[in-house]
């Protein structure tokens, strides 16, 4: 069935990609899960635990544990909301922003090297991105309707 092959194709590239990205993250003393949350904060700051959990489709306790490590490593700051004391806003520290920029450059070099070894056109990449974004939105909606 084509739809099964379609989804399996995404799954099959995930682990090999992680194996290539891990040395970059290890060099900067950050785990992949931490990197994903740090990147999410960088793109959406200020943000909250709940917003991160929703966007990343992860449980709040998992996000909380990862955020704790990022705070302990002085990569993010937490500020209480003036309107709602229960709400806390997360932003990158200068150290976190510097790490984000450095890791982004290293990961981008890796990604460009992989793409250069293929015959994928810019249009094909953009179409794939569009399709994956559509699927991601649907999956998030489905997950939150449970």
Swiss-Prot record:
Which Gene Ontology BP annotations are present?
A: response to stress
The protein's GO terms of the molecular function aspect are: DNA binding; DNA-binding transcription factor activity
Q: What keywords would UniProt list here?
A: DNA-binding, Transcription, Transcription regulation
PROSITE patterns, alphabetized: HTH_MARR_1, HTH_MARR_2
- Domain (HTH marR-type): residue spans on this chain: 1-137
Q: Which InterPro entries does the record associate with it?
A: HTH_MarR-typ, MarR/SlyA-like, Tscrpt_reg_MarR-type_CS, WH-like_DNA-bd_sf, WH_DNA-bd_sf
Q: Which domain of life is it from?
A: Bacteria
Q: What is this protein called?
A: Uncharacterized HTH-type transcriptional regulator SAV2265
